[in-house]
């Protein structure tokens, strides 16, 4: 049995692996709950477009609207 000493306490290998797996899978869920985007992006929030033609600009704006 492997025992690791961290900050003066002893932990077994399975305890460390469960802690790592828990932080990997639960951490992003907690982060997404805490830092949720409150309002959708508006047209002002879109960076300036460097389209070469009006059609290209319309295509980009349509794509952004569909994939919000």
Curated annotation (Swiss-Prot):
**Localization:** Mitochondrion inner membrane
| Known function | Mitochondrial membrane ATP synthase (F(1)F(0) ATP synthase or Complex V) produces ATP from ADP in the presence of a proton gradient across the membrane which is generated by electron transport complexes of the respiratory chain. F-type ATPases consist of two structural domains, F(1) - containing the extramembraneous catalytic core and F(0) - containing the membrane proton channel, linked together by a central stalk and a peripheral stalk. During catalysis, ATP synthesis in the catalytic domain of F(1) is coupled via a rotary mechanism of the central stalk subunits to proton translocation.
Entry-linked Pfam families:
ATP19
Protein topology in the membrane: Single-pass membrane protein
Which keywords annotate this record?
ATP synthesis, CF(0), Hydrogen ion transport, Ion transport, Membrane, Mitochondrion, Mitochondrion inner membrane, Transmembrane, Transmembrane helix, Transport
Kindly indicate whether the keyword Heme belongs to this entry: no
Give a yes or no for keyword Mitochondrion in this entry: yes
From the record, give the transmembrane residue ranges: 13-35
| Quaternary structure and interacting proteins, as annotated | F-type ATPases have 2 components, CF(1) - the catalytic core - and CF(0) - the membrane proton channel.
Protein name (record): ATP synthase subunit K, mitochondrial
What family is it from? Belongs to the ATP19 family.
GO cellular component, alphabetical, reads: matrix side of mitochondrial inner membrane; proton-transporting ATP synthase complex
Could you tell me which species this protein originates from? Schizosaccharomyces pombe (strain 972 / ATCC 24843) (Fission yeast)
Name its GO BP terms in alphabetical order: proton motive force-driven ATP synthesis; proton motive force-driven mitochondrial ATP synthesis; proton transmembrane transport
In terms of InterPro entries, this protein maps to: ATP19 (IPR021278)
Main location as per UniProt: mitochondrion
């Amino acid at each position: 049995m492997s025992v690791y000493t961290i900050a003066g306490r002893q932990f077994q290998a399975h305890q460390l692996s469960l802690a790592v797996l828990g932080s990997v899978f639960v951490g992003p869920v907690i982060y997404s709950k805490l830092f949720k985007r409150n309002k959708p992006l508006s047209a002002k929030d879109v960076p300036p477009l460097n389209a070469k033609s009006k059609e290209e600009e319309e295509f980009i704006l349509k794509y952004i609207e569909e994939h919000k």
